[in-house]
A protein has these predicted regions:
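Inter-helical turn/loop segments and adjacent helix faces that build the functional surface
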Residues: 134, 194-205, 242-246, 294-303
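Sec-dependent N-terminal signal peptides
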Residues: 4-14
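Carbohydrate-active enzyme catalytic cores, enriched for enzymes
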Residues: 236, 242, 279-439, 480
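A mid-sequence, solvent-exposed acidic-amphipathic segment
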Residues: 224, 248-251, 261, 265-273
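Alpha-helical cores of eukaryotic small-GTPase signaling modules
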Residues: 234-262
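Extracellular glycan-targeting catalytic surfaces
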Residues: 18-223, 229-236, 256, 289, ...
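Active-site rim segments in enzyme catalytic domains, especially the processed small/beta chain
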Residues: 424-481
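Secondary-structure capping and boundary motifs in well-ordered enzyme cores
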Residues: 119, 176-179, 227, 255, ...
């Protein structure tokens, strides 16, 4: 027992002091993670993380030499389902519906690289939590080794977009700076956790090979909406990793592109992101939550009322089974359950908010608590068996109403078009009987599939009025009563 206590006392100060005030996990965070890892539910999370790390290590860990493409191309053109990923088949892509390997298409091969990078990102995150939770140096070494490989490859990648051309929104590792930013947002956290076991030369290699060129690329990408929110998240993470307050300041305070500017421009007063889709709400929300967490080390508090409403609004608009109506360019079947890890952090950061506890309780009726983020929230979530009795809600600015009677729900949509991800679907209706959706909005398929523009973005595909089978014009409806 004394030896274990000594390990904890040595491990935490070593991890923090090496970072000179730039870190992603506070001393309290690390203490909570280590305490949670000793509980019965925490041990289960640790075992799950270990299993996923070992499963990844069964395949080659070498970083791809080829630049990535566009994840929306990794879909069967006939069945519109995502290909099944195989580490051993970078040029053959299996569709589970047609039982066929698709070959000879470079766009599929480039998208395979995207998926490989995503699996590596998950591997690095899991190693990060395992090192924080156990202090076992091997997990920090796994992070170091893979990041050194990435640093050696990243500087060889060419700037490119999804068409393999040089464009204003291209990346290096991926075909989009959007994906580049998302990857950096989490991987920088893993880097900082493992940094204390690295030599000066190893740190320099990772900085020069990956961190600096990635930050330079993202500083050149000045966009808007969910793209820029992720650019900012990536820049904040890179700024912390490079101990560079200038980068962090640009990401937060730039008057056109910064965090505050995007929050002011795109978040409605009712809490919804302006593109009007659960998918396109949670996508920037995760970036904003990562940003808020990352700048705590610089004594900057972004956990304000507006971010709270961004977390609370979509959670209060779900069906009884916690699925969302698939508005605009949103995946059909999107669920609050898939976002539960965000609410683990939200519950902790917003002083044990009771609504966020209710969200966690409802989500864990359907899924296991096996997320690394749960370790930071070192409490046992009380189990519930009944569906939540959440009230009807009207999102005035976003323009839709969720009407509830028991577990039955009717959703009426009339609001703004939704920008570049909007659909011509004003006055549409969706109905859920408590067990399943019986009148649906189908949302969208992958953007690389022809049906995306030929069907999913047509008025005819929605449960609303259509005149002569023609599409509605971009418009905003009205709520009359």
């Amino acid at each position: 027992m004394k030896n274990r206590l000594l390990l904890v006392l040595i491990f935490i100060p070593c991890l923090l002091s090496a970072q000179n005030g730039y870190y992603f996990f506070t001393e309290s965070d690390i203490s909570q993670i280590r305490s949670a890892a000793k509980t019965e539910w925490g041990k289960s999370i640790i075992e799950s993380l270990k299993d996923t790390v070992e499963a990844r290590r069964e395949y080659p860990l070498t970083v791809p030499l080829l630049e990535g493409g566009h994840i929306h191309d990794y879909f069967c053109p006939e069945h519109k389902v995502r290909f099944s990923f195989d580490w051993n088949k970078p040029e053959a892509h299996y569709c589970s519906q047609c039982k066929h390997y698709w070959t000879g298409n470079k766009r599929y091969d480039w998208a395979w690289v995207n998926v490989a990078h995503t699996h590596n990102y998950t591997y690095l995150r899991n190693c990060m939590y395992l090192y924080l939770a156990t202090g076992n140096k091997v997990y920090a070494e796994y992070i170091r080794n893979m990041l050194l490989d990435y640093a050696s490859k990243y500087i060889t990648y060419l700037d490119h977009d999804t068409a393999r051309k040089v464009g204003p929104w291209g990346g290096k590792m991926f075909g989009q700076s959007l994906d580049e930013s998302a990857w950096a947002s989490d991987v920088c956290r893993a880097y900082m956790v493992a940094k204390s076991i690295m030599t000066t030369n190893e740190i320099r290699e990772i900085e020069k090979g990956y961190l600096i060129p990635c930050s330079e690329l993202l500083l050149r990408r000045r966009g808007t909406a969910n793209w820029q929110v992720w650019h900012n998240s990536g820049l904040i993470a890179l700024g912390v990793a490079l101990q560079n307050d200038s980068i962090i300041n640009v990401a937060i305070n730039d008057p056109e592109c910064g965090y505050h500017a995007q929050m002011e421009r795109y978040v409605m007063d009712d809490g919804w992101w302006g593109e009007g889709s659960p998918t396109y709400h949670y996508y920037p929300l995760r970036a904003m939550l990562l940003s808020a967490d990352a700048v705590r080390c610089r004594n900057i508090n972004l956990y304000d009322r507006k971010l709270y409403k961004m977390l609370a609004a979509p959670a209060s608009g779900v069906y009884a089974d916690l699925y969302f109506p698939a508005h605009n360019d949103g995946w059909y079947g999107e669920s609050l359950i898939a976002q539960v890890s965000l609410y683990e952090i939200a519950y902790q950061r917003y002083n044990k908010d009771p609504f966020f506890l209710s969200v966690l309780q409802q989500c864990y009726r359907y899924t296991d608590r096996n997320f690394g983020e749960a370790l930071q929230n070192n409490i046992e979530i009380p189990q519930v068996t009944a569906m939540a009795a959440w009230p009807s809600v009207h999102f005035k600015e976003t323009g839709y109403a969720v009407l509830r009677s028991g577990t039955k729900t009717v959703v009426m949509k009339y609001g703004p078009h939704g920008g570049g991800h909007g659909h011509p679907d004003k006055l549409s209706i969706s109905i859920h009987d408590g067990e399943k959706e019986i009148v649906s909005d189908m949302g969208t398929c992958a953007y690389g599939v022809p049906a995306f523009t030929k069907w999913y973005r047509k008025t005819l595909s929605h449960s609303t009025l259509t005149v002569d089978a023609k599409d509605q014009k971009e418009s905003t409806g009205k709520l009359l009563a």
